[in-house]
Amino acid sequence: GDVYKRQEESIEKMVWKLGDTQAEDHPEVVSFGQFGEKLEHLTNGQIQVEIYPNSALGNHREMLESVQMGNLEITKCMSTDLSFYVEESAIFGLPYIFTSLEHMDACLIGGLKDWFNNLLAEKDLVVIAWLDAGSRSVYNSKNAINKMEDMNGLLLRVPENDVFMSSMAAFGATGTPMPMGDIYSALQTGVIDGAENAAPVLYSMKHYEVAKYFSLTEHIRTPDVLIMSKSYLE
C-alpha cells in the first residue's frame, strides 16, 4: 500500500489550460467545467482543467498558435477557424450545408470527422470533441429581416473567414471581421450594424442590449471543436 501511494504521489500532476472567446455563462463554457470535473475524477486528480473564457488568452488564431507551440493545452474554436491550417475546413461555413443538427451529426459520424482529423494530424492538431454551437442567425440595430432584400447594405461582423464574408456578400450585406470582445461596443457606437451568431452568444455577450432585431435566418450551422496538440496528447 505504501509503495502504491508513493508511486501515485510521484506522478506529476498536470494543469490543462482551456481557452475560449465566449463568456463564462455560455453553455459551452459551462460544459467545460463539467468536462474538467469528469477528467479530474477519471485521472484521480492527476489532471485538472483551468478555464479561461472571454478571450483571456487571445482570439481563436492566437490560441490555436499557442496550442501548436505548446503554451496552451486546449482551445475551443469553430471548425472553420482551422482554415488557417487546413483550407478544407472552410466547407463547414458554407450556408445551409447542414439542414439540421441530426444531419450534421450523421455527416460527422459518417466519416467527415475522421477525414478532418487526418488532415489536422499533418499540422500536429487533433479534435478531442465535436460540439453543437447552434445555428447562426443575423441580429442588427437597423431593421428586421423578413426577406433577402432586408439584408441589403447591412454591415455585419463575421468571423475572420473568407467563406463567411463571401456568404454575407451573396446575401446583399457586407461582412467585416472583428474579435468577439469588440462586437458590443461596435454595435453600441454604430461602427457595425449587426452581427451573426447563435442565440446563446447573443444572450451571454449581452448583444441584445444594443441590437434590437434578431432574425432566425439559421444560415450557417458549423460545429465547434476542442483542439489539442496531437503530439502532446500522445
What spans do the regions from the language model cover?
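N-terminal secretory/targeting leader peptides
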Residues: K5-H103, L112, N118-E234
